[in-house]
C-alpha cells in the first residue's frame, strides 16, 4: 500500500511539475508577446493576469494537496486505490453499513445469550443448592439411621449375651433339678426298703432351724411371687411369640423387649442368689434329716410333695431349688400312728412316682424343646444381627457413595462455578469488546460523516476545479493559439530580420560598390570636369540614402536586441521562480516522505494492534464456541467476510500491479517527451545562457524523479521479501543491470 501511495504521489507530483512548467512557459511566452505587441499601458493588466494565474495555481496546488491527502486517507483506511473509484467507495460504504448492522445484531445476540447464561446460572445455582440441601438432609437422616442401627445392634448384642446367660443359668438349674430328683429317688427307695413303719420326730434344733429358714424363705418367696406372678404365668406361653415378633416388629417393641429383658435379668440375678441360699439351707436340712429317722412323717402331706413337679415345670424359670425347701419346711411333725394300709400307700406312692417320672420326662422334653427353640431364636437373633451388620455395611456403603456423590457434585458445582466465572469474564470481555466496537463504530460513523462532508466539499471543489480547469483549458487553448500566432509572428519577424540583414549586407555591398564607383567617378571627374556637378549630386544622394539605411538598420537592431534582452530577463526570472518552486516542491516531497515514514510506523503499530485484536477475537471465538456451540452462523459470516476481504486484497494487488505497469509506461513516455521539450525550449531562445539553463533544469527534475522512484523501490525491496524478484526486475530496468547483477541482488540476504 505504501509503495503504491508513493508511486501515485510521485506520478501526481511529476504531472503537476510538468503541467506547471508548461503553463509557466506558456504564460511567459504570452507575457513576452504581449509586452512586445502591446504598449506600456497594458503591462499592469499583464501583471494582474499573472497574479491571478499565480493565485489560480496556488488554489490548484491546495486542491491537489487536499486531493492527495484525501486519497491517502482512502488508501489507508479503505481498500480503494484512487478517488475516481466511486463504485468501490459505494461498495465499501455499503459493506461498512452491512458490517455495522451485523455487529449490532451480533452484539444484541451476545447480550441475549449472556442474559440467558445468567438465568441458566441462577437456575443451576438454585438447583445445586436444592440438591445439596437434599443431600445434607439425606446424610443427616442416614447418620441418624446409622446411630439408631448402632443402638439396636448394641441392644441386640446385649440381649444375645443376656439370653446366653439365661440359657447357661437354665442349664445349671436343670442339672441341679436332676441332681435333686435323683437324690429324692434315692431317699424314696431307702424309705421303701425300711420295714419299720414308725417315724421319729426330728430334733428340736433341726426343726427350729428349718422353721426359721422356712419363714424367711416364705417372706422372700411371697415378695418374689407378687412380682413374678403377673409375668410368670404369661411368659411360658408368650415367650416364643414375643421373640418371633421381636425380630419383625419395629423399634418400639424392641425397646419394650429390652425392658422385659432387663427385668428378667434382675429376676434371674435375684433367683440365683436365692437359689444359692436355698441350696445351702437344703443341704443343712437334708443332712439333719438324714441323721434322724423319719418316724413321725405324715403321709397326708405327700400330696404336696407329689404335686410340686407340676407347679415347678409349669414354667421353665421356676427351679426345683426354689420348691424343694418349701416342701421340706412345710412338713409338720405329727405323732406316729401305725396304719395297716401302708402297702397300698406305698403302691400309690410308687404310682405317683412313676407319674412324677413321666411328668419329669415330659417336662424335660419340654425343656429340651424350649432350649432348642431358644437356640433357634438365638440363631435367628444371630441372623438378625448379621442382617443388621449387612444393613450397616450397606448404610456405610451408601454413606461412602453419598460422600463420593457429594464430592462429585461439589466438583461439578465448582466446575459450573468456574464455567459461570468464565462466562462472566467472557461477558465482561464481550461487553468491553462491544464498547470498543461501539466506540469504533461511532468513530467510523463520525469519520464517515466527515468523509461524506469532505466528499461533498471535494465534489464541489472538484466541480469548481473542473470548471476552472475547463476555463483554464479554454484559455490555455486560446493562449496556445495566440502563442502559435506569436510564434508565427516571431518567425515572420525573424525572417524579416534576416531579410533586413541581407538587405543591409546588400546595401553595404552596394555602398562599397558605389564608393568604388565614386572613386572611379572622381577619377572620371578629374578627367571629365564637365559631369562633376551631376556626380556630386548623385554622391550626396547616395550618402543620404546610405545614412538613412544605417540609421534604420541600427534602430531595428537596437529594437530587436532590447526585445531579446527583455525576453531573456523574463526567462531568467521565470527560471529563478521555477527553481524556487522546485526547492519548495522538494521540501514538500521531503515532508511527504517524513509523513510517509510516520504513516509506516503508524501502519505497523496498527497492524500489530490488528493482529492482537485478531488473536483476542479468535480466543473469544474459541471461548464462545466452547460455551455456545450455536454460533456457527456468526462464524460462517465471519468466514465469508474473510473471504471477501481476501478477494478485495487480491483485487487491490491486481490494481497495484496494473498501476505499476501504467506508471512504467507513463514514466517511459515522460522520458521520451522530455528531449522534445528540451529541443522546443532551445529553439525558442538563441542565447547560449538560456539554452544551458533550460537544458539543465528538466534534467535536474528528471534526476529528482528518478531518485525518488529508485528510493521508493529500494524501500519496497527492503520491506517486501516475497516480491523481491519483481523489484529486482524493476531495478534492472531502471539501472540497466545484467543477469549476473540480478542474481547478486537476489542472493543478498537482508
From Swiss-Prot:
Q: According to the UniProt entry, where is the signal peptide?
A: none
Chain positions covered by the region annotation Disordered:
14-53, 188-280, 672-703
Q: Where is it chiefly localized?
A: cytoplasm
Going by the UniProt record, its keywords in alphabetical order are:
Coiled coil, Cytoplasm
Residue ranges under compositional bias (Low complexity)? 676-693
Q: Name one GO cellular component term.
A: cytoplasm
Question: Coiled-coil annotation: which residues?
Answer: 28-182, 213-243, 344-665
A Pfam family = GRIP
Q: Where is the composition biased (Basic residues)?
A: 214-230
Residue spans of biased composition, Basic and acidic residues class: 18-34, 188-198, 269-280, 694-703
Spell out the Polar residues composition-biased ranges: 201-213, 233-251
GO terms, biological process:
Golgi to plasma membrane protein transport; intracellular protein transport
Q: What is this protein called?
A: GRIP and coiled-coil domain-containing protein C27D7.02c
What organism, scientifically named, is this protein from? Schizosaccharomyces pombe (strain 972 / ATCC 24843)
Lineage, top ranks: Eukaryota, Fungi, Dikarya, Ascomycota, Taphrinomycotina
Amino acid at each position: 500500500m505504501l509503495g503504491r501511495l508513493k508511486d501515485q504521489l510521485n506520478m501526481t507530483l511529476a504531472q503537476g511539475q510538468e503541467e506547471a512548467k508548461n503553463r509557466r512557459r506558456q504564460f511567459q511566452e504570452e507575457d513576452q508577446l504581449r509586452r512586445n505587441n502591446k504598449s506600456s499601458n497594458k503591462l499592469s493588466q499583464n501583471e494582474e493576469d499573472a497574479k491571478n494565474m499565480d493565485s489560480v495555481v496556488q488554489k490548484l496546488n491546495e486542491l491537489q494537496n487536499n486531493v492527495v491527502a484525501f486519497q491517502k486517507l482512502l488508501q489507508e483506511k479503505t481498500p480503494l486505490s484512487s478517488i475516481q473509484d466511486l463504485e468501490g467507495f459505494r461498495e465499501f460504504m455499503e459493506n461498512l453499513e452491512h458490517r455495522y448492522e451485523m455487529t449490532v445484531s451480533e452484539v444484541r445476540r451476545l447480550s441475549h445469550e449472556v442474559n440467558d447464561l445468567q438465568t441458566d446460572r441462577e437456575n443451576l445455582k438454585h438447583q445445586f443448592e436444592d440438591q445439596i440441601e437434599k443431600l445434607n438432609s439425606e446424610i443427616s437422616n442416614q447418620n441418624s439411621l446409622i446411630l439408631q442401627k448402632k443402638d439396636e445392634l448394641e441392644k441386640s448384642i446385649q440381649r444375645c449375651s443376656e439370653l446366653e446367660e439365661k440359657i447357661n443359668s437354665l442349664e445349671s438349674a436343670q442339672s441341679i433339678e436332676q441332681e435333686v430328683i435323683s437324690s429324692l429317688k434315692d431317699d424314696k427307695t431307702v424309705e421303701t426298703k425300711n420295714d419299720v413303719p414308725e417315724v421319729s420326730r426330728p430334733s428340736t434344733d433341726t426343726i427350729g432351724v428349718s422353721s426359721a429358714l422356712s419363714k424367711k424363705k416364705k417372706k422372700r418367696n411371697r415378695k418374689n411371687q407378687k412380682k413374678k406372678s403377673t409375668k410368670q404365668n404369661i411368659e411360658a406361653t408368650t415367650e416364643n411369640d414375643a421373640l418371633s415378633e421381636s425380630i419383625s416388629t419395629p423399634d418400639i417393641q424392641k425397646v419394650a423387649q429390652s425392658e422385659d429383658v432387663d427385668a428378667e435379668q434382675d429376676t434371674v440375678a435375684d433367683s440365683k442368689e436365692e437359689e444359692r441360699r436355698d441350696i445351702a439351707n437344703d443341704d443343712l436340712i437334708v443332712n439333719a434329716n438324714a441323721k434322724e429317722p423319719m418316724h413321725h412323717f405324715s403321709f397326708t402331706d405327700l400330696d404336696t410333695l407329689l404335686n410340686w413337679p407340676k407347679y415347678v415345670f409349669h414354667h421353665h424359670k421356676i427351679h426345683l431349688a426354689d420348691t424343694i425347701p418349701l416342701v421340706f419346711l412345710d412338713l409338720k411333725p405329727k405323732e406316729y400312728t401305725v396304719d395297716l394300709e401302708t402297702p397300698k400307700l406305698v403302691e400309690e406312692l410308687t404310682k405317683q412316682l412313676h407319674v412324677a417320672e413321666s411328668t419329669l420326662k415330659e417336662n424335660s422334653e419340654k425343656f429340651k424343646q424350649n432350649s432348642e427353640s431358644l437356640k433357634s431364636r438365638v440363631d435367628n437373633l444371630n441372623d438378625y444381627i448379621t442382617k443388621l451388620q449387612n444393613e450397616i455395611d450397606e448404610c456405610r456403603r451408601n454413606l461412602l457413595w453419598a460422600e463420593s456423590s457429594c464430592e462429585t457434585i461439589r466438583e461439578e458445582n465448582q466446575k459450573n462455578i468456574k464455567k459461570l466465572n468464565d462466562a462472566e469474564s467472557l461477558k465482561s470481555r464481550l461487553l468491553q469488546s462491544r464498547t470498543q466496537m461501539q466506540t469504533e463504530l461511532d468513530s467510523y460513523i463520525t469519520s464517515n460523516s466527515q468523509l461524506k462532508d469532505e466528499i461533498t466539499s471535494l465534489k464541489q471543489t472538484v466541480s469548481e476545479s473542473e470548471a476552472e480547469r475547463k476555463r483554464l483549458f479554454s484559455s490555455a487553448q486560446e493562449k496556445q493559439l495566440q502563442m502559435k500566432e506569436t510564434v508565427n509572428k516571431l518567425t515572420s519577424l525573424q525572417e524579416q530580420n534576416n531579410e533586413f540583414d541581407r538587405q543591409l549586407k546588400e546595401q553595404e555591398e552596394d555602398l562599397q560598390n558605389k564608393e568604388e564607383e565614386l572613386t572611379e567617378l572622381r577619377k572620371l571627374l578629374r578627367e571629365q570636369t564637365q559631369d562633376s556637378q551631376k556626380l556630386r549630386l548623385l554622391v550626396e544622394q547616395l550618402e543620404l540614402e546610405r545614412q538613412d539605411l544605417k540609421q534604420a538598420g541600427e534602430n531595428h537592431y537596437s529594437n530587436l536586441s532590447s526585445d531579446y534582452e527583455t525576453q531573456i530577463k523574463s526567462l531568467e526570472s521565470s527560471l529563478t521562480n521555477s527553481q524556487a518552486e522546485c526547492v519548495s516542491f522538494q521540501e514538500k516531497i521531503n515532508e511527504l516522505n517524513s509523513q510517509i515514514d510516520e504513516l509506516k510506523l503508524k501502519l505497523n503499530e496498527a497492524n500489530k494492534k490488528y493482529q492482537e485484536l485478531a488473536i483476542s477475537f479468535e480466543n473469544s471465538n474459541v471461548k464462545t464456541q466452547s460455551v455456545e456451540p450455536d454460533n456457527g452462523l456468526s462464524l460462517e459470516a465471519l468466514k465469508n467476510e474473510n473471504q471477501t476481504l481476501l478477494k478485495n486484497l487480491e483485487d487491490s494487488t491486481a490494481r497495484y500491479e496494473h498501476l505499476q505497469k501504467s506508471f512504467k509506461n507513463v514514466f517511459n513516455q515522460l522520458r521520451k517527451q522530455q528531449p522534445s521539450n528540451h529541443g522546443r525550449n532551445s529553439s525558442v531562445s538563441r542565447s547560449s545562457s538560456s539554452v544551458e539553463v533550460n537544458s539543465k533544469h528538466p534534467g535536474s527534475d528528471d534526476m529528482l524523479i528518478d531518485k525518488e522512484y529508485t528510493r521508493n523501490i529500494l524501500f519496497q525491496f527492503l520491506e517486501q521479501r516475497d516480491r523481491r524478484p519483481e523489484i529486482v526486475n524493476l531495478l534492472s530496468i531502471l539501472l540497466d543491470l545484467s543477469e549476473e547483477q540480478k542474481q547478486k541482488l537476489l542472493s543478498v540476504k537482508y
